[in-house]
Amino acid sequence: MGRGALILALAAATTAPMAGKPPAALISHDAFPGWPSDFEDHPLKPLPLTERESGYVRDFPGRVGRFSDGKREVVVRWVIEPTRRLHPSADCYQGLGYRIVPADSERDSAGRRWSAFHAIKGEQALHVRELIAGADGRTWSDISSWYWPAALGRAVGPWWAFTVAENQDTRAGKSE
C-alpha cells in the first residue's frame, strides 16, 4: 500500500465513528421544560446559585438549578448539547478544597446506576452521587461514559444531570 493510500485509510478509520448520526440536533434554550418540583418523592425548594455556579453557567449550553429537599442539596443541569463544560461533580468539590474518596456505585428505586463518592473538608463529610439521563430514557453514571455517545449522536438529548449531596451523618441515620 502506498503512503498516500495509507494516510487516506488512517484518516477514514479515525473519522469513521463520526460518520454515523450527526451530533445531537440543536435544541433551543426556549425548549426548557422547567425545573422538577420534586425529586425522589421529596419536594424541592429552589436555592440561589453560588457566585461560582453563576460564573459557570454563563457559557453553559443549558441551564443549572440548585435545590434542597430539606436534607439534601440537589444540583440539576439541563444540557442541550454535548459539552466538556459538563464535568464530574468530584472535580467541582475538589476545586472547592474537598478531599475526594471514591464510593461504590448505587442503584436507585428505578434500577438506575449512580456513581458516588465522599467529599471531605475539615469536619464536613458529604456523600455525593451523580447521574445523567437522556430524553430517550438511557442513563449514565458518569460524565465520561455519557460524553462520547452524546458527541457522536448516539445519545438523545436534551439530558438531565443530577448531583445529590447529603451529610454522611444524615445518611447514616437512614434505615437500610
Predicted feature descriptions by range:
Residues V156-E176:
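Surface-exposed amphipathic alpha-helical segments
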Residues M1-K21:
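Internal/C-terminal transmembrane anchor helices
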Residues A19-D30:
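Aromatic-capped interface at the extracytoplasmic side
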Residues P33-L152:
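Short, solvent-exposed recognition patches
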Residues M1, P48-T50, T170-R171:
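General structural signal for secondary-structure boundaries
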